[in-house]
Each structure stands twice: as C-alpha cells, then as structure tokens.
Amino acid sequence: SSHFVGISLGSIVIRQLAEMNPERVKSMIMGGAILKMNFRSQILMKVGNLFKYVLPYLVLYKLFAFIIMPKNNHKKSRNLFINEAKKLYQKEFIKWFKLTAEINPVLKWFRQKELNIPTFYVMGEEDYMFLPAVKKVVSEHTQSSSLFVIENCGHVVNVDKAHVFNEKVIEFITQQNS
C-alpha cells in the first residue's frame, strides 16, 4: 500500500482508486480537492458546454483559469494551467470537458461516504470555488479527515505555496508512518 497525493481533478482519481482498492491506499493527500461543483462552477460548465465547439478551446481554458484563479498571486498557477492546456488538442479538451460535466454524481457519493483511510486536505484560503465543500466534508468525516488551509493561496496549492504544501504533506506522511 502507498500514500497517494492528488491535486485538483487528481484528487477525484485517488478517491476512486481508494473506493475500488482500499487495501492499496495507506493515506490520501488531496491538494485543491474538488468535492463539489458549486453554483459558479456549474455555470462555468454550462457556458463552456455552449461554446466548446464555437470558441477555440484555448479561449475557454484561459477564461476557466481566470475564473478559478482570479488573483494576482495565482498568476503562476494560471499560466501553468494555460501552458499545459496548449499541449492539448480540441478533441482532448472536449473529452476533458465531458468528464468534468459528468462528475457530479461521483462527487456526491464521495461527500456522503467516509472511507476509513486517513485523508489530508490541503486547500488555499482563496480557493472560493472548492474550499467550502471540503470544509463541510471534513466536519462530517471526523474519523479519517483533516484539513490544512494555506493563507494567501488559491486553488493550485502545490504551485502557489509549494514550500508550505510540501512541508505539511511530508509532516502528514511522517505521522502516518510512525
């Protein structure tokens, strides 16, 4: 078994892995975890869905990046997000988009069911789209979940505040191994 670290949509992949094979997961570290698509993100998805075949996908990606990471101190994360998007083709973007549009039932299940696996959420205090849902889940999943919120930090915590993120994750894993 191993410790798994996932950022943003990667947290969904780790949680699914833990659902399917809990014996393989020693702990889960979720950075910028997505546990619920809030009202803004739902609107964002609907707008994107309307324009995904009309607008160049890079325009939509830039819009998403700015909405999810709007502040000046999120610029590095925004640029990383956009530069990675440039490596995708329109077809791949549409597949990614369909995946995110269909994720709600899975996220609801994750919020309702607590796994008996230590779970450490590391979130940015400025992650207005996803932090509220994580706070709620941690308050309900008290047996296995804990949360650390990084000040002056947005959604992509491992980029915005890499040093703090790494320090806290290593501390958590060390505690799990003792």
Could you tell me what each predicted segment is?
Residues 117, 131-139:
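Short alpha-helix in the alpha/beta-hydrolase fold that links the catalytic acid
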Residues 15, 19-20, 25-55:
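Flexible "cap/lid" loop of the alpha/beta hydrolase fold
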Residues 144-178:
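Catalytic active-site module of serine/aspartate enzymes centered on a nucleophile-bearing elbow/loop
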Residues 125-130:
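Acidic catalytic loop of the alpha/beta-hydrolase fold
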Residues 115, 121-123:
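Short beta-strand/loop motif that positions the catalytic acidic residue
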Residues 39-41, 58-113:
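Conserved alpha/beta-hydrolase catalytic His-Asp/Glu region
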Residues 1-8:
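Alpha/beta-hydrolase fold nucleophile elbow
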